Amino acid sequence: MACRSWVLGILLVLVGCAGPEVHQGEVTTVVIQPVQEQADIANEPFVLTGRLAVNARQHRFSGGIRWQHTGQSDEIYLFSPLGQIVAEIFRDQTGVRLVTSEPAIYRAQNAEYLTSQVLGWELPLAGMRFWVRGTHFPDTVAEKDLDKNRRTVAIRQDGWQVVYQNYYPAQEGMSVLPRLLEFSRPDVKMRLLVDQWQGETKSGDATGRKLP
């Protein structure tokens, strides 16, 4: 019963998060061309914890997520509603490794292929490490919708649409970070609710933000 209530809680929160939606008022659309230089944001570390709901054609997932990112690596843990690890995804310069709860270990050169083959839905890690921070992947063309405060409302890139439904309130010395996002393409829809961000402030000090 507790498990069912936990899952229902995830779905209710991910369907409608309290707080104002960001896509209100006038929106400006810009097209951004690829750049050869790697964006500095790619090297900025972060840790996020939250809840993820995935609805693919034949596969679904609802549970927790913990994602630790550095410029050289990613570690992503997916959890069941009861807190058990469902999958561990590791990326470094040698490729990507996915460990399931059996346990079984799978390897590939990119997370997109590996997750689609093992989990049944694609985790677009190359773009997602930028999208979760409200910006575009610099290697390919992106179409970006901005509100009057130049905050990202939506990104369309590499066949994906990312919609930013809620942000953390702005705080002095910190960048504005997304709170509730939706990633979609015709065969899959994902909703991510970030419960807590940890990273670096503009002054270089460690910081964390948590939902009220």
From Swiss-Prot:
Q: Under the cellular component aspect of Gene Ontology, which terms does the record hold?
A: cell outer membrane
Q: Among the record's GO biological process terms, what is one?
A: lipoprotein localization to outer membrane
Q: Does the keyword Lipoprotein apply?
A: yes
What InterPro entries does the entry give?
LolA/LolB/LppX, OM_lipoprot_LolB
The lipid modification N-palmitoyl cysteine is placed on 17
Keyword tags: Cell outer membrane, Chaperone, Lipoprotein, Membrane, Palmitate, Protein transport, Signal, Transport
Q: Where is the lipid attached (S-diacylglycerol cysteine)?
A: 17
Q: Output the PROSITE patterns linked to this UniProt entry.
A: PROKAR_LIPOPROTEIN
* Keyword match Transport: yes
Instruction: Extract the Gene3D superfamilies matched here.
Output: Lipoprotein localisation LolA/LolB/LppX
- Offer one Pfam family short name for this entry: LolB
Q: Where in the cell is it found?
A: Cell outer membrane
How does it sit in the bilayer?
Lipid-anchor
* Signal peptide from the UniProt entry: 1-16
| Main location class | membrane
Subunit note? Monomer.
Show the NCBIfam families listed in the entry. Answer: lolB (TIGR00548)
Q: Which family does it belong to?
A: Belongs to the LolB family.
Protein purpose: Plays a critical role in the incorporation of lipoproteins in the outer membrane after they are released by the LolA protein.
Task: State the protein's name.
Answer: Outer-membrane lipoprotein LolB
Q: Which organism is it from?
A: Nitrosomonas europaea (strain ATCC 19718 / CIP 103999 / KCTC 2705 / NBRC 14298)
Source organism lineage? Bacteria, Pseudomonadati, Pseudomonadota, Betaproteobacteria, Nitrosomonadales
